[in-house]
Amino acid sequence: MVQLCLIGTKKVSLNMIKERIQTKGDDLKMLQGHDRLAYLIDIAKHVESLPQEVKTETNRIRGCASNLWLIGGAKEDNTMIYKIDADAFITKGTAKLITDLVNGCPKDEVAALTLEDFIPLGIRELLTMQRQNGLGSLIQRIVDIANTK
């Protein structure tokens, strides 16, 4: 399910990542609200669980309605890779969708993303306020990891 941003040796720009987000948002908008949630739940069912030893407070995303953990870093080629786990399907599916959009993308491009760049996904309006806060915290942590590793 992960679609890498790099094809061959082609460098991916920030605009290309934003286009991927827009395209995924357009695809999701074809689904009605309940069907979008069902899609997120289906994604979550295919996420491999993180080992217990990385489910620490340091890796937990604060502000979520449920427990969400994110680990990540830059690979040798300076592209980012993230893995998530959560104890609720909607949270897990949402986080997996977000990380799939940035996995394999250049570190500097991921570091330049903002919460507003993800608005075209159209997910925020499906989430409770607390889950929206968690989504913002997840995106900020993704960017922070890209800025530090």
Segment roles from a protein language model:
Residues 23-24, 94-97:
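A general alpha-helix detector
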Residues 14-67, 74-77, 116-149:
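N-terminal intrinsically disordered, cationic/polar leader segments
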Residues 58-64, 82-86, 108-113:
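Solvent-exposed interaction patches of small proteins and small membrane subunits
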Residues 75-89, 99-103:
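Conserved interaction-surface patches within small, structured recognition/assembly domains
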Residues 104-121:
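Glycine-rich phosphate/pyrophosphate-binding loops
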Residues 36, 90-94, 106, 114, ...:
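Amphipathic alpha-helical interface surfaces
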Residues 1-15:
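N-terminal amphipathic/basic-hydrophobic helices that include classical n-h-c signal peptides
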Residues 16-19, 89-93:
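Short acidic alpha-helix initiation/capping motifs at coil-to-helix transition points
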